[in-house]
Amino acid sequence: MLPSNFNNCQVSLDDALKELQELKSSNELDFEIRIVREITDREECLDMVLGTNLPQGSELENGKLVDLVVGIKKNETTDTIKETEYELYLQKLNDKNLTDLNLLTSPVFGTSNVNQLIENQELITYIKSENPLNYKFLFSEAQGIIYGVDEKNNVIKLLDISIKTVREKESGLHTFDFVKFDSSNYLLLTYSGTDGNYYLSAFELLPENEVGDEIVLIVFELQNDNNVHFGGKILQEEDNLFLCLGDLNSPGNSAKFDSPWGKVMYFNKNDLFETPITSHDDPRINYIVYGLRNPWSCFEHNDKLVIPDVGSIHWEEVNILSNYLNAEEPVFLGWPWLESYFDANYKNTPVDEQTKQNQLENAVFPQYTYPHANDYCAIIGGTELFSSEKWDGYFFIGDFCTGTIWAINVEKDSDIVVLEKNIVPFSITTINDSGNGTLLVGTTAGSILEIILP
């Protein structure tokens, strides 16, 4: 039975954990324990249990989830909570024999050098080196502007749609790419519009690096006044365009097919230029993945689809899908029922119980994961390096809060840290290929960094 004093700061986090572990041992129970931080102004409640997700006196049973809500100061978490959290996360991984998947234990490989190429811009959302405009690279800002950068690192404005979008949390301009249609080159981009819609649009590239008028290829209605969990990454394969979308902060979207959110889809690009897609049930849409929460990026790697999915409050995921175009049914990646390998404690019912069970039975789990511990918070993707023999077979992902960057080679079962935490003084937002064997990294502070790998 859940102790009656697990509320109103009557018991410390350490004592609560000891008591729960004793209950597990003495009663041969197997239930999950998590720590949930909650900001409090009460000094006496720091590192103390404010409450739980269960009514006091609840029966503790196998499979139950116990969330210990612990008081913290705003923007300050004590070492006690950090250490205890990480120990709990390690125990969860150990219980499922998953410790090898934890990226926080990856060894450090050499020392990378960091050069600042661009500074004093707005939040960077995407960077691309390969382009038909002869720029060294281009980058986008969340506020709705795309720039080209020449060989002297001069920044030249290419497109400004800031009147159509707004930077608010994760809303704004998300990504861009280039596509050829009827012998003309087009700039593609995704953005959340101020009119309550989400757009995949094209702009023809004209002489003198001018761009034509907007051609809407896809428009999806946004739900409510949402400003997070868009995704928006564009991929290409022959005549197909792929779009990776988040759940719009409505987890049920990811489990059902009455909206495009929380999914990866593809469609023939030629059809879009003739008639835009305006509904999630347009027959031209091919859904291939669902069960996503907030994929800031997705990318192809050695004929695989890599989807780093930002977790809720506990776990980050690296999903790697083989033969993703040949699956008979869309692949389910777990959300909202699972966060990584673990119960997400989602209680709403977007689908019936039988559908939920079928989804759980067929869920595909991430190949790598890491917990929200030791200041790590959100997974950022991602790229491979196409012009580097040394790093052939690897792809690169990072963590938003710490600036850590990992290199992963699935075939060699190798995951290593190539940029240690806290070297980059800003939160990183995107990791891309420079075309010269180095990484280009964007930040929330409007900087673009070149990472010269060891």
List the model feature ranges, each with a label.
Residues 81-251, 297-311, 375-412, 434-453:
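Acidic, Gly/Ser/Thr-rich repeat motifs that build Ca2+-stabilized beta-propeller blades
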Residues 19-27, 57, 71, 126, ...:
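Structured segments of extracytoplasmic/periplasmic soluble domains
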Residues 1-85:
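Ligand-recognition elements built from short beta-strands and adjacent flexible loops
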Residues 71-74, 205, 268-269, 321-322, ...:
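Short beta-strand-to-coil "C-cap" segments at the C-terminal boundary of structured domains/repeats
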Residues 1-10, 77-79, 108, 163-164, ...:
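Second-shell loop/turn segments in exported
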Residues 38, 57-59, 71-73, 142-144, ...:
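Solvent-exposed coil/turn segments that connect beta secondary-structure elements
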Residues 87-98, 132, 171-173, 247-416, ...:
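Beta-propeller domain segments
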Residues 13-17, 231, 261:
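Extracytoplasmic/secreted envelope proteins and their assembly/folding machinery
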